[in-house]
Amino acid sequence: MIVNQALIELTKQVAVAVEEIKFSPNSTSNNSTPTNNKLKSSSSSISNCDSPSSKSKSNSSTSTPTSQPQTPSQLPQQAQQQAQQQHYSANSMNPYYAQQVLLQLQKPSTFVKHVHVVVKNTPFGITLRSKEPLQFNFQNYVIKATLLYDSDPPKMVDFIHNEPLQYVATVSEDGSEVCVDVKVGILSSQHQGSMFLVVLHISHCSAPTPSNSEPISTILTNIGNNSIHSLNVTNICVVSHPIRIVSKLDHVKKEGIPILKKRTFHEILTDKLKKLQKSQDSQSKWIKNLYQQHGAQYDMEPYNSTLHSQKTDSLCSSSTSTPSFNSTSSSSKNQSQSIKNEEEEDGGEDEEEEGGEDNDNESESSNTNSTQLIGKKSINKLPISTTTSSSNFNNLMVNNNINNNNNNNNNNHLIQNTTFSSTSHFQNSFNRVVEVYNLIPEYERVEVIRKMVQQLKSYDLEQLVSTFIDELKCGYESTIIS
C-alpha cells in the first residue's frame, strides 16, 4: 500500500451515540508456537464479528474467571479467542485497520476504534470530501456501498431476498463533497451486538461497477489508492467507522452510552456564519492580491448600507429625469397617486428641466412658485389646434391657469405652514402633464391624445375626468375658505 496523505477523507458520520474502543496489533504473533497459530487461524475463521461489550471487557488488565469448570484443552483456546478479540494480527485483512494504518502514515501501536451506534431502518449520513477537487471530482465518479462484518478477516453480509443496505448519494454543486445517506435494513436476532463496516466503492464513470462480492484483496488495494500521489484513481475504496445497530433508541439508554445531542438552531446558524465569514475572508485575500498585482489601492472599508443609499440619492438628485406620458394606465387614482409620490420624492427635478436657474437646495416655497411659473409659461407657449381634442385640452389648461392665479395669493400661508396641500400637489402633477404635452411635436399631439383615449376604457376615462374635476373643485373651495 502507498503510505501517504489520503485523497478522500471521511469528514462526518452521523450516529445516535459513539463508543471508543482501543485496539493494538498482536506483537506476539511471530513468536507463537505452531499449535497456537493453528488455533488462532481456526478461531479467526469461526468469529464473524466482534461484540463491543466483549471487546471492552477484554481490554481490562485481568479477566474474570468463569464459574463453570474448564478442561485444560479449552483454556488455551479461550486465551487465543480473547487475544484475537483485543488485537489485530500484523498481516490483518480488516479494511478499517488498513485504512487507519494509511491515515496514520505508519503502523500504529494502538489506535481508537470509534463505534457508531445507529437505529435500524433509520438513515444516517456519511460525508466524504476531496482534498484535491481539481484532481478528483465526485461528479465524474459512481459510488456503490456494500456491508461487511467488522472482523478479521472480514466477511460479506449474506441476505436472501432484499439487500440489508440501502443508500442514496448526493454530490455537491462543485463536486468536492458527497453525502451518502445509508439505511441498514432488518437483520436477524443473531446479529445483535455485531459490528459492521460500510465500504464505499468509488469508481470512475468509464470503469466497470464493482460487484457486491468484491474480493477483500481488491478492497485493500483500492484503499491504498486513496492517496494524493496515487497514479490510479479509477477505483478507490473508503471504509466507514464501525457500526453497531440497535432496534430502538431505548437500548442505547439502557447500556448507559451517552447519546449525542441534536444540534440546536443557534449552533447551526453559528456554524453557517463561521463558514460564510471564512469564505469572505478568502475572497478578500484573492481580491487584495489582484489589486496588488495591478498596482491599485485596495479599500478595506466594509460595506455600509446607509452610505451606499446616500451616494445613490446624491447621484439621483444630480441627474435629470425626463417625465413620461403614461397612456396605458388602468386607473386614474393610481395615476394621480403615483405622480404625487414622484413629485414629493423628486422635489426640484422640474425646476432643473424648465427653469435651469434654480438650485437643488431651495425651500419648498420656492419650489411651489417655480412650478406655478412653469405652468404659466407652458400654457402661454401652447399652440392652438383646430381639432376637438386639442381645444378641450387647451380649455382645461386655461381653467388651471385661473386656479393658479387664485392660489398665488395663498403662497405666504403655505410657506408658514411648510406643508403642501392637495391643490399644490394637483398643480404640480398637472404641470408635469403640460410639460410632457409641450415635449410632444405639434403634429403628433392629436394622434397621441387619440391613442390615449382609445386605449383607456370608458370607465377609466370617466374616472379620470371626474378626478380632475374633483381636484379643481377642492382647489377652488380652498381658495374661497382662505
From Swiss-Prot:
GO biological process terms held by the UniProt record: sorocarp stalk morphogenesis
MF terms (GO), sorted A to Z: sequence-specific DNA binding
Biased segments, Acidic residues type: 342-363
Residue numbers spanned by region Disordered: 24-88, 307-376
Any GO CC annotation of this UniProt entry: nucleus
Compositionally biased residues, Low complexity: 24-86, 312-339
Superkingdom of this protein's organism: Eukaryota
Matches recorded under InterPro entries: CudA-like (IPR040430)
PANTHER family: PTHR38092:SF4, REGULATOR CUDA, PUTATIVE-RELATED
Full protein name: Uncharacterized protein DDB_G0270306
Organism: Dictyostelium discoideum
